[in-house]
Curated annotation (Swiss-Prot):
This is Isoleucine--tRNA ligase. The keyword Ligase applies. Its cofactor is Zn(2+). The gene is ileS. One of its GO terms (molecular function) is isoleucine-tRNA ligase activity. InterPro entries: aa-tRNA-synth_Ia, Anticodon_Ile_ABEc, Ile-tRNA-ligase, Ile-tRNA-ligase_type2, M/V/L/I-tRNA-synth_anticd-bd, Rossmann-like_a/b/a_fold, tRNAsynth_Ia_anticodon-bd, Val/Leu/Ile-tRNA-synth_edit. It comes from Bacteroides fragilis (strain ATCC 25285 / DSM 2151 / CCUG 4856 / JCM 11019 / LMG 10263 / NCTC 9343 / Onslow / VPI 2553 / EN-2). It is found in: Cytoplasm.
């Protein structure tokens, strides 16, 4: 019994999704995709680890689809593509989530909850949504090994991190420093520069700013002649003014002394500021006013410039402490030089608070300016603001320090206040901020020259969304700047998609690289493996658990530890299995309890910091295989490293992409990835960021349930390039489902229907190309061109182009052209060679399309492929994803034939558009198309497909006319946007010349693509792209132009043409009745039609034609037709009775 191609009663891609998933699972197709490629060249892919403590979103479908496409493609190209899933399990997001769920803050850890209990919650919480992630990954068809993922909290993973840190340590690239660093009070930890540069971290905020008046101690004589002399300095952070210890001027900046008044108090003042910024602070209209005429409250405040200075002229001048709450000691309150001072804004004089700015600290230190520091109860030096973001309270300070250095009466009013309302749980943005309070105090004290709201760009914590402070921290750093040039050099070898990200966003980041702040003052993360003596005389960096085990043994012998906790738990050094490593925990607090012994017998405690969680993910190429403790040869021999391809969102440019690159460069002097796609954001259809709060987030689970994964993936990939932002619109998914998948489904259904009727199973040998009709040779030529182009697109990481090429082929060439033109070949009786050629050709197209689309639309591609080979047995694989990617066959390509058929499609499209313009249906024959040919090549192409064009557009003849014959009058119109910049003042003369072009000149322009004018001895060359060529309609004709092609359609309908049109319309209506009546395609029928003067002549003349077309044995006209179907035409109706014989 012959096999039948599957026929479906409905088109349901959601069901296809589920059926194919079941098949994959039952047949272990993903596993086979790797095992069946054993011994083949490897294509290395790294999966960036997501965090499972949050639900996956629609943007994850986009990111994972991009990864899946190229892994599937490379598998089909014969590579072995192993892809290991991973989980990012440490860090701030996890900790903040746990704190929120437990209702605690960082300060509660170690007090109301132990570190061990807290970290146990983190370990549990971080995997909270693992099932949802696995479910989405499964349903969307992303093949990645989730049964054996790498997990960053795993002890073996951490061991590799320690080994990497030790390599950096041995190279002198790991050091400890006390510097000003970005610090998040809300998170309670320092941040690295790449964290600070995550998208959206810098945002515009409106803050209260002040131009402060710093009273001079030793003014120059001319400065003391009018009122009180001051230096003016502007700040956007008034809360830092109590910590001011210096003012900074630029070495090449010109400054002026200005006599005027304070606008708030009306007191006379002489102020110094940059000359270039004079008009920013004094109204030029007041320059002519006399100082003595000013009255307090006048809108215009008079001013007078009395002297000019260079920056160095002001250096060394002293001033009184602005806000004397705390005495910083000797050497403060002087004017110093700084190269970074500019006149872009402010006053050209910078207020220096060394404890709250990196530049401030640097210039102050160089000039011997002390920072303003407090002494706490422990005797430690601290900045005025504590780690929670508030001024220290008096209770928290050393009593002796308070007596000697603190003005309690002034300070107590502000002690304990948060410097930003965002840090205070009891305040909102509407409450008065500390900045405002300080500014108001300064205003009353005649210390504020100008107070105003100012919008500026300010950094925020990437996880808490709250403002960041620049704060002095004891931190461990990676000296990444030492390898900056090598990072830049290696980056140039990476294939970035888009290229602009590599040269721009990423490249510029590398050029401005800072050292990597590795320290994090948190609890749940990878502990820094450095132990130090209390006096910092000795330190050890541990690179493995075995080394730590041995060092503990020495500590036990020295009496610092009672026993070795790892030995107690049965841990065996050198045994790398999971069971052995699960006996221990390298996290806090257990690792903190380990005391080591120095060379000279002193106890050593671990540095309390954790490491930046971005180091965790950046180390995954090595840690996922427990390098170098296991799989050393695999990595060293480049079998699993570097990655051939990675992909993540654009927000990872300065995150995962950077840390991968940095670690690889510094430790291995290598790239860690050869090619990378940086995909854009998924926004809502209006271009807004999606969020649950705004209600515009799209649920990926329900979307896949409704539409299936394939339309979602295809829409996301073909709508815009992966690196562009996608404005996500659910309507687009439905359009893709209908236009592409629906068309492909209908094409397959057509094939299956007739192949089953004729028993076609592709058991016959392939017909040679020269024995196939021209239309078959054409579609196979176009198919092979498609194979070549799609293969190139996938290989060059251009999935959008690949998907669009496949869509265009299916819609325009396969369905709308080949199948439509060849329907009769499949309908015909008998099994001729012509019919065999049609079946083989259409089958080949469908099978090839299934393979080409498989990387993007894995489900329907597999269903289509399986439905085809399940009957023909032309391949012995269980899934399209185990098949080989189609190979380009140059011998089957005929570019001349493709050009001819393209001409047929172009002419047909233009003529059909003209028909729609006057509402003449295609079934209504028309007499003539007139085409003014540009050259002999164009004419030859049209001649070759002349009959096909006439059939497609239903015209009786095609006439060729000389382009200059005057039958069709063409005109040219200038595109001034293009020609204007090109010709400038000549444009008017050029436009006049273009308007006067002869028909011969226009023909030459069309033929050559350009034309040269003589403008009074000067040549002017225009190109066809610079102008619009159009033809005027002539009576009874419609004209259309596209590029070099012009067609004119005669739209006059004669009586003869009208009768033929009616016959064709009746055929169409009767065919629809056959279909709706459920007749088989082979059933013959008898027809009775009611008489009507509008149609009788046509029926009599075309009786045989109508019967032949609808398989009618007879067609009779009757005065009355009972039980007939009514057929409605534009201005009449009639009845027809259709009876099956």
């Amino acid at each position: 019994m012959s096999k039948k191609f599957a026929e479906y009663s409905q088109f349901d891609l959601s069901k296809v999704n589920k059926d194919v998933l079941k098949k994959w699972d039952e047949n272990q197709v993903f596993a086979k995709s790797m095992t069946e490629r054993e011994g083949c060249p490897s294509f290395v892919f790294f999966e960036g680890p997501p965090s499972a403590n949050g639900m996956p979103g629609i943007h994850h479908v986009m990111a994972r689809s991009i990864k899946d496409i190229f892994c599937r493609y490379k598998t089909m190209k014969g590579y072995q593509v192993k892809r290991k899933a991973g989980w990012d399990t440490h860090g701030l997001p996890v900790e903040l989530g746990v704190e929120k769920s437990l209702g605690i803050t960082k300060e509660d850890i170690g007090k109301t909850i132990s570190v061990a209990e807290y970290n146990a919650h983190c370990r549990q919480d971080v995997m909270k949504f693992t099932k949802e992630w696995e479910d989405l990954t499964h349903k969307m068809g992303y093949w990645v090994d989730m049964k054996h993922p790498y997990i960053t909290y795993d002890n073996r993973y951490i061991e590799t991190l320690w080994w990497l840190l030790k390599q950096l340590y041995k190279k002198g690239l790991l050091y400890k420093g006390y510097t000003i660093q970005p610090y998040s009070p809300a998170a309670g930890t320092g941040l690295s520069s790449h964290e600070l540069n995550q998208p959206g971290c810098y945002r515009d905020v409106k803050d209260t700013t002040v131009v402060a008046q710093f009273k001079m101690k030793n003014p120059k004589p001319e400065m003391a002649q009018w009122g009180t002399p001051y230096f003016l300095a502007w700040t956007t952070t008034p809360w830092t003014l109590p910590s001011n210890t210096a003012l900074c001027v630029g070495p090449k900046i010109d400054y002026v002394a200005v006599q005027s008044y304070n606008a708030y108090t009306g007191q006379p003042i002489t102020v110094v500021l940059a000359k270039a910024l004079l008009n920013a602070h004094f109204n030029p209209k007041a320059a002519e006013l006399k100082l003595e005429d000013y009255k307090a409250g006048d809108k215009l405040v008079p001013f007078k410039v009395i002297a000019e200075y260079k920056g160095p002229d002001l250096v060394g001048m002293e001033y009184e402490q602005l806000i004397p709450w705390v005495n910083p000691g000797e050497g403060a309150f002087r004017v110093i030089l700084g190269d970074y001072v500019t006149t872009e804004d402010g006053t050209g004089i910078v207020h220096i608070a060394p404890t709250f700015g990196a530049d401030d600290a640097q210039v102050a230190k160089a000039a011997g300016i002390p920072p303003l520091q407090l002494v706490n109860k422990k005797g430690e030096l601290r900045p005025m603001v504590d780690l929670t973001g508030k001024f220290y309270t008096l209770d928290e300070l050393d009593e002796d320090f308070i007596k000697q250095r603190v003005n309690v009466d002034l300070y107590k009013e502000y002690a304990g206040r948060f410097v930003k309302n965002a840090y205070d749980p009891n305040l909102s943005d509407q409450d008065e901020s500390l900045d405002v309070s300080i500014c108001m105090m300064m205003k009353v004290n005649n210390q504020a020259f100008k107070i105003e709201k100012h919008v500026h760009n300010y950094p925020h914590c990437w996880r808490t969304d709250k403002p960041v402070l620049y704060y002095p921290l004891d931190s461990w750093f990676i000296r990444s700047t030492a390898c900056k040039e090598r990072m830049i050099e290696l980056n140039k070898t990476i294939n970035w998609k888009p290229e602009s990200t590599g040269t721009g966003r990423f490249g510029k980041w590398l050029e401005n690289l800072n050292d990597w702040n590795l320290s994090r003052s948190r609890y749940w993360g990878t502990p820094l493996p450095i132990w130090r003596t209390e006096d910092n005389s000795d330190e050890k960096c541990i690179e493995s658990v075995e080394e730590l085990y041995n060092e503990i043994e020495k500590s036990v012998a020295a009496g610092y530890m009672q026993s070795n906790p790892y030995k107690d738990k049965g841990f065996v050094p050198g045994e790398y299995n999971e069971e052995n490593y699960n006996k221990i925990d390298l996290h806090r607090p257990y690792v903190d309890d380990i005391i080591l012994v120095s060379k000279d017998g002193k106890p050593m405690k671990r540095e309390a910091d954790l490491i930046d969680v971005w180091f965790d993910s950046g180390a995954m190429p090595y840690a996922q295989i427990h390098y170098p403790f296991e799989n050393k040869e695999l990595l060293d021999s480049h079998q699993v490293y570097p990655a051939d391809f990675i992909a993540e969102g654009v927000d990872q440019t300065r995150g995962w992409f950077f840390t991968l690159h940095a670690i690889a460069t510094m430790v291995f002097d290598s790239v860690s990835y050869k090619a990378v796609i940086s995909n854009g954001l998924v926004l809502d259809k209006n271009g807004n960021k999606m969020s649950k709060r705004l209600g515009n987030a799209v649920d990926p689970f329900s979307t896949i349930e409704q539409y299936g994964s394939d339309p979602l993936r295809w829409y996301m990939i073909t709508n815009s390039s992966p690196w562009d932002n996608l404005k996500f619109d659910v309507d687009g998914i439905e359009e893709v489902r209908r236009k592409f998948f629906g068309t492909l489904y209908n094409t397959y259904s057509f094939f299956a229907l007739y192949a089953n009727v004729d028993g076609f199973e592709y058991k016959e040998a392939d017909l040679p190309m020269n024995e196939r009709p021209e239309i078959d040779r054409w579609i196979l030529s176009v198919l092979n061109t498609l194979v070549k182009e799609v293969d190139t697109c996938y290989n060059e990481y251009e999935p959008t182009k690949a998907g669009r090429l496949i869509s265009d082929f299916v819609n325009d060439n396969l369905s709308n052209w080949y199948v439509r033109l060849n329907r009769k070949r499949f309908w015909g009786g008998g099994f001729t060679q012509d019919k065999l050629s049609a079946y083989q050709t259409l089958y080949t197209c469908l099978e090839t399309v299934a393979k080409l689309m498989a990387p993007i639309a894995p489900f329907y591609a597999d269903r289509l492929y399986s439905d085809l080979i399940g009957v023909t047995g032309r391949d012995n694989v269980v899934s399209v994803h185990l098949a080989k990617f189609p190979e380009y066959n140059e011998k089957m390509v005929d570019k001349e034939l493709e050009a001819q058929m393209q001409m047929a499609q172009d002419v047909t499209s233009m003529v059909l558009a003209l028909r729609r313009k006057v509402n003449i249906k295609v079934r209504q024959p028309l007499q003539c198309i007139m085409i003014p040919v540009v050259d002999e090549v164009q004419k030859a192409h049209i001649e070759a497909v002349k009959a096909l064009i006439m059939s497609e557009v239903n015209v009786k003849e095609i006439k060729f006319v000389d382009g200059a014959a005057g039958v069709l009058v063409k005109k040219v119109k200038c595109d001034f946007k293009k020609l204007g910049p090109k010709f400038g003042k000549q444009m008017k003369a050029v436009a006049a010349a273009v308007a006067e072009m002869s028909q011969e000149a226009i023909a030459e322009l069309e033929k050559n693509g350009k034309y040269t004018f003589d403008l009074g001895g000067a040549e002017a060359v225009i190109e066809s792209a610079d102008v619009e060529i159009f033809s005027e309609d002539i009576p009874g004709w419609l004209v259309a132009n596209e590029g070099k092609l012009t067609v004119a359609l005669e739209v006059t309908v004669t009586d003869e043409l009208r009768r033929e049109g009616i016959a064709r319309e009746l055929v169409n209506r009767i065919q629809n009745i056959r279909k709706s009546s459920g007749f088989e395609i082979t059933d013959k029928i008898k027809l009775t039609l009611s008489k009507n003067p509008q149609t009788d002549d046509a029926v009599n003349e075309y009786n045989s034609y109508i019967c032949n077309q609808v398989l009618g044995t007879s067609l009779t006209l009757a005065d009355e037709v009972k039980d007939g179907t009514e057929l409605n035409f534009d201005d009449f109706s009639l009845f027809v009775n259709v009876v099956k014989e």
